[in-house]
Regions:
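Juxtadomain coupling helices with adjacent low-complexity linkers
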Residues: 121, 126-155
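A short, aliphatic-rich beta-strand micro-motif
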Residues: 104-114
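Regulatory sensory and allosteric helical modules in signal-transduction proteins
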Residues: 41-46, 57-97
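Short loop/turn motifs at secondary-structure junctions and domain boundaries
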Residues: 30, 97-103
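Glycine-rich acetyl-CoA-binding "A-motif" of GNAT/NAT acetyltransferases
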Residues: 116-119
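Short hydrophobic/aromatic beta-strand element in the GNAT-like acyltransferase core
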Residues: 35, 107, 122
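Intrinsically disordered, low-complexity terminal regulatory regions
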Residues: 1-67, 143, 154-155
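Short coil/turn motifs at secondary-structure junctions
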Residues: 43, 55, 113, 128-130
Length: 155
């Protein structure tokens, strides 16, 4: 497997030449998760800006717009990261409507480092089946999140 620095260089190259939608495919290439996505907070909703699906299928409606208070991303905003290999067994998600629907999820914040310094969204890998994310892929996800602010904010 290529080094973390190599994977990030590839991600940055595609991000700069083809945009975030295509860069998510690069980000997803070394993880077991079906989906990689970038969500943007707008009011009380998280809106999917870009989604890569390994199967190339149309994005399910329930993934397009998610109420913030029902999202797994709320934990990313509050705690700086959220990771669960199996949401159906995760007590932190008790009473969450997506518990047991989205099974595995790892998300990190996207921060507006060019303006307010606030969290504006999340970058995540997730699946409808159980997966764990390797430590090096978590590092790639964290570092990639620092590269996508302009693409997320459209600047």
């Amino acid at each position: 497997m290529p080094s973390i620095d190599r994977r990030l260089k590839d991600f940055r190259t595609v991000l700069e030449s083809a945009g975030l939608a295509q860069a998510l495919e690069v980000l997803n290439s070394n993880v077991p998760h079906r989906y990689s996505a970038a969500y943007r907070l707008t009011g009380a909703l998280l809106r999917n800006q870009f989604l890569f699906d390994k199967r190339g299928e149309v994005s399910p409606e329930f993934l397009k717009t998610v109420p913030f208070d029902s999202s797994f991303c709320q934990f990313v905003f509050r705690e700086g990261v959220f990771n669960t290999a199996d949401s159906s067994l995760d007590a932190r998600l008790a009473d969450n409507p997506y518990q047991g629907v989205v099974i595995s999820y790892t998300g990190v914040p996207v921060i507006d480092q060019f303006g307010s310094g606030e969290v504006v969204g999340s970058l995540c890998h997730f699946d409808l089946v159980r997966h764990a994310l390797e430590d090096d892929e978590f590092e790639v996800l964290q570092r990639a999140s620092r590269l996508i602010t302009r693409a997320m904010l459209g600047s």
